[in-house]
Amino acid sequence: MKKFRARYAPSPTGHLHIGNARTALFNYLFARHHGGDFIIRIEDTDVARNVEGGITSQLNNLKWLGMDWDEGVDVGGSFGPYNQLSRLELYKKYAFELLEKGYAYKDFKEGSEDFAIRFKVPENVLYEFDDVIRGTLKFESKDVEDWIILKDNGIPTYNFAVVIDDHYMEITHVFRGEEHITNTPKQLMVYDALGWEYPTFGHMTIIVNEDRKKLSKRDTNTIQFIEDYKNLGFLPEAMLNFLSLLGWSPKDDEEILSKEELISLFDEHRLSAAPSYFDKQKLAYINSRYLKALSMDELKDLTRPFLINHGIEIKNEAWLESLLSILKDRLSYGAEITKYYDQFFHHDFVLEPAVLEEIKEFDNEVVIKGFMGAISSVDFTDDVAINQALKDTGKALNIKGKPLFMPIRIATTGEAHGPSLPVSLSLLGKELVIKRMNKTLEVLKGETK
């Protein structure tokens, strides 16, 4: 059986966009699942729109996501060169072959000997192909006008060059966005004129935003580029996992899947034609699942730069570990550590009525004042000493369990539930703990008036 070969063919006109990353991923998963080759080809003929560093950025972000490729502009291969500007003579050869065979004609510039080569669309021809995702698609030639295949400057147009490249690189399968469906008739015309076999096409669904409109680069409510997610502290494994679910689904309901599992499970026939919703909450959830699986050292390495850039002094490794032990379960991505740090330490301490309702039956004032007395000489860098102060308070007041711990937790953190109370108090520091308990006493006093 012929070896499957799939490709991702970006233009160097910008950084790696969500939609392009998904296109690359589905071609990658297809090739790896079937034991085929994954190729990256650069379509760089639109020189005016090419961005310096655009390709390097795209390739780096694909690698960050965990993808690798068998052939490409950076790794070489037997079917190169892998950028179009290095293949101009090949396009010219076939453009003139079509010209000589009568499938194309010269289109002269007015008042000049310069000419483009325009493809002559045949009359009354029905073009059809079987799309892996959408079934049989048909087009009539009467709906397509004659079109340029080679500009007067020797640069090929997209719909011509892509056929030459896919044929010469022996591409067997092309998975791309549905916006390319309308390009397909022109490409089929070139395949037929040159007597070449079509690759198998699959046109993927559009990605839509929360308004169910097509996600575009102008949509400011959704982060569009992989680089931005990387800079926010999203994990590459989570991003890869999330992207795989934008238009594809496994047979069962399990959605947390490693790259190896995705390769094993991938089935191109489960790609959907229905619009795929870019669910930001789902992305946050998936990333949080991967964050929870990190070791403490990995979590420290992820969050440390965000804390430092936020101007937060990391006192020592033990302090950072204590902070993360309290905040890690709240994190959806790395940069969020600064938001929760600020909420924990610096926000205006507010006691919500619903929280106070949970302790209305307890002897709150007595417990809080008793604990304030017990910590007067306690070293707040010592969790064990703080825990002992809690025990001493309970023993002195003959109170234990919720009636002891909940008033102190609410008085110091503003929350009824949370992680280890001694660790939380140690992080807050004695000065802030006493300040908050005094404020709580004032609030409680006001409620009893």
Swiss-Prot record:
Compartments reported by the entry: Cytoplasm
Annotated disulfide bonds: none
Motif ('HIGH' region): 10-20
Gene Ontology terms: cellular component: cytosol
UniProt-recorded Gene Ontology molecular function terms: ATP binding; glutamate-tRNA ligase activity; tRNA binding; zinc ion binding
InterPro entries: aa-tRNA-synth_I_cd-bd, aa-tRNA-synth_I_codon-bd_sub2, aa-tRNA-synth_I_CS, aa_tRNA-synth_I_cd-bd_sf, Glu-tRNA-ligase_bac/mito, Glu-tRNA-synth_I_codon-bd_sub1, Glu/Gln-tRNA-synth, Glu/Gln-tRNA-synth_Ib_cat-dom
Quaternary structure, from the entry: Monomer.
NCBIfam families from the UniProt entry: gltX_bact
Amino-acid positions noted as binding ATP in the UniProt annotation, renumbered to this chain: 217
Main location: cytoplasm
Gene Ontology biological-process annotations: glutamyl-tRNA aminoacylation
Its job: Catalyzes the attachment of glutamate to tRNA(Glu) in a two-step reaction: glutamate is first activated by ATP to form Glu-AMP and then transferred to the acceptor end of tRNA(Glu).
Keyword annotations from UniProtKB, A to Z: Aminoacyl-tRNA synthetase, ATP-binding, Cytoplasm, Ligase, Nucleotide-binding, Protein biosynthesis
E.C. code: 6.1.1.17
The keyword Plastid is assigned to this record: no
Protein name: Glutamate--tRNA ligase
'KMSKS' region, short sequence motif: residues: 214-218
Entry-linked Pfam families: Anticodon_2, tRNA-synt_1c
Family, per entry: Belongs to the class-I aminoacyl-tRNA synthetase family. Glutamate--tRNA ligase type 1 subfamily.
Organism superkingdom: Bacteria
Enzyme class: ligase
